[in-house]
């Protein structure tokens, strides 16, 4: 077995894996913290732009008094993390803008809105009772006013409504230091016959990504006893949607970077998800016994924000499991931690990637040393191997037998040269997954402008290099590395090996620039190591 053939096989396998990723990307009760709560009082000031009454002192849900209508009143919630607008008619979420995330890298870009255009038509955070859209029926009022939360404070808004003989109270609690919203619902059957009914908590949003984005699709996901389940096929979501019954810890609409999740408080629900008019909708429905004049209490939590593991870990239902890197999860997550550690000292993710590359190279240095040594030994055996090929001709069995004896005699491992490459493949794909699925790297720049120009260059390490400079340089370094590698005796193998840099360059054109920077720097370090090895051999 020829060492160069093994390396060629590994390189081609690597190219196939990269090509596959390029052409077919993957389709994939909590105790309240001891915090100071700010419950908005009816006499708090309300912005003059908000229509409707300044305050409504509403009766207790158990009361038979009529509720004063406050239809159309828009209440705002301001925290350091987001700005939300809640409509008093049913407690609908009109907008939820993330203050720390921009829609694009442009300086005047608006904040990311987790609701988006036209999604209000599908009633985000709408409550459905026995199939009735509660926000579109009955009379609603509210208690409280605009909230402005800082530190670790909590704030509460209360919405009460009479809908088809039911008295409903929705109590929404907002967290200043998280994107979490906790909801407690009380329902009293005032005039309907006793019996079983249904309540569904819902949310909806526009597509979080471009419809044709294969690498970062908008998905409907849920987590049950079997683990994480995802559906991103738009045809499936439009035509039939998805349904899951039983113990569903949470359901969500998400992308690589953002998520809208609802976490039902019930042990058993029916989760439904669908794409309607380009709006993604999910609902978690549960059965409830509505005996007349008996109060029923229900609960649900929402999270509308970035895929931030630390913040999501504070949400019930193991929501942090939504961050999943697939097969390479065990590698990608430590790489994310390492990148974050380097970033806290460099304040630049590009530099953090370079430092991480150096650390990885140092860890692989002994193996690479053995690899280059093995390749040099194989190079010295080439004349003897050529004689064996000439001697045995087409007798492959005899040729292989004598070659194995030759390797044994000179203590050479024919597969030794490919070991570092094999070990780097999972690291490569782990970093690929990390760059594509870590919100901290979204819009993270390295060299914002091309030096000495005002041309935007590496302004987003999660996106491709718009000028294609780094993949071309990466290909050039790979070509140089091939030229320095001891050549194979087979001319055909030599030609294929020299052609590989062109194949890799083509595939890397649309890869995240952060990943290209990693591979380019890795090539440069490999060239330096190989040069040192060659110099030592000559000496």
UniProtKB/Swiss-Prot annotation:
Pfam family, one: YidC_periplas
Gene3D superfamilies: 2.70.98.90
Compartmental location: Cell inner membrane
Molecular-function annotations in GO: membrane insertase activity
GO terms, biological process: protein insertion into membrane; protein transport
Recorded topology in the membrane: Multi-pass membrane protein
Residue ranges of the region described as Disordered: 28-63
Keyword GTP-binding set for record: no
Main location: membrane
Transmembrane stretches, start-end: 6-26, 349-369, 421-441, 496-516
NCBIfam families, per database record: yidC_nterm, yidC_oxa1_cterm
Function: Required for the insertion and/or proper folding and/or complex formation of integral membrane proteins into the membrane. Involved in integration of membrane proteins that insert both dependently and independently of the Sec translocase complex, as well as at least some lipoproteins. Aids folding of multispanning membrane proteins.
Protein name per UniProt: Membrane protein insertase YidC
Gene name of this polypeptide: yidC
